[in-house]
């Protein structure tokens, strides 16, 4: 969950407890996990990280400078866990509720000294060879100035089937790797929130996870990075209730992963984490301990 610190988790749990007529409690599926750990998120050059450096730390196991994607502070490419496992025969899926070329998902397949090199990062989807990508769209899909060939066309010309929305996904070419994009993200720089009038044609992250699992199949082991990216976006915008709803939406994906775990307990590992906390969220005191 991008930007999902302990404050955000506690708030979502508290909201769900209130809805259930309870005081306190662990309502989110991942709040009930048996193990909990905390970490420092400072980057190689700043006390306050950004998603690029933090995503790279998660993906590659090495701290780097803010704005760096999949490279060390000197700009040397790093190898992410996704590449390591792909080389070992795992199928790989990378998915998010924000643009697929945004910082955190990009850290698992991209290499760029600037997180804002969206166009070039998008083209690295092809280089990765990963079997499934999902997101709300592509930032700068025709380049920063809008004067380059559309990146989705480039991706399709180089071996992938780009599917806009569930209908195109169902009609996909099953012999090709897949990039799933929300219908509302067609030919635009996307921005969408679950509780802010999301398009009916769009799917939540749990449904995207289902799509990814369907593509990756069960004949080979697989690795999935599934990000609730809008948690961070809502927190940046000071939309507290939207932040809560995004966490609840993300938790539905965790619940689906748990169902898979229950079917394959000896070969499944689920890790829920955050690249950083966003917004310094604090649960306040109204004078009546509410």
Residue ranges of model-derived segments:
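Short, contiguous strand/loop micro-motifs
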Residues: 67-69, 199
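Glycine/charged-rich beta-loop-alpha catalytic/anionic-binding loops adjacent to active sites
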Residues: 65-67, 235
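Short secondary-structure transition/capping motifs
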Residues: 47, 70-74
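Mobile, glycine-rich extracellular loop/lid and propeptide segments
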Residues: 1-11, 58, 63-64, 72, ...
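A post-motif C-terminal structural segment
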Residues: 4-10, 14-56, 102-290
């Amino acid at each position: 969950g991008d930007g999902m610190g302990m404050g955000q988790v506690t708030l979502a749990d508290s909201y769900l407890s209130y809805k259930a007529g309870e005081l306190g409690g662990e309502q989110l599926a991942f709040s009930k996990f048996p193990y909990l750990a905390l970490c420092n998120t400072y980057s190689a050059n700043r006390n306050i990280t950004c998603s690029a450096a933090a995503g790279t730390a998660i993906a590659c196991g090495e701290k780097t400078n803010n704005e760096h994607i999949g490279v060390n502070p000197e700009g040397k490419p790093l190898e992410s866990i996704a590449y390591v496992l792909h080389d070992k025969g795992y199928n790989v899926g990378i998915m998010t509720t924000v643009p697929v070329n945004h910082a955190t998902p990009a850290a698992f397949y991209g290499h760029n000294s600037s997180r804002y090199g969206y166009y070039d990062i998008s083209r690295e989807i092809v280089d990765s060879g990963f079997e499934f990508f999902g997101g709300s769209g592509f930032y700068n899909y025709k380049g920063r100035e809008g004067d380059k060939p559309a990146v989705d066309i480039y991706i399709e010309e180089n071996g992938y089937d780009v599917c806009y929305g569930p209908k195109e996904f169902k009609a996909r070419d099953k012999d090709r790797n897949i990039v799933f994009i929300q219908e509302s993200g067609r030919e635009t720089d996307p921005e969408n929130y679950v509780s802010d009038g999301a398009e009916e044609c769009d799917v939540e992250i749990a449904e995207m996870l289902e799509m990814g699992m369907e593509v990756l199949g069960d004949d080979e082991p697989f690795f999935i990075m599934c990000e609730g990216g809008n948690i961070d976006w809502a927190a940046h915008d000071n939309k507290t209730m939207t932040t809560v709803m995004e966490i609840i939406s993300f938790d539905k994906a965790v619940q689906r992963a748990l169902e898979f775990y229950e079917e394959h307990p000896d070969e499944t590992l689920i890790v829920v984490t955050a690249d950083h906390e966003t917004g310094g969220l604090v649960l306040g005191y109204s004078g009546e301990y509410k």
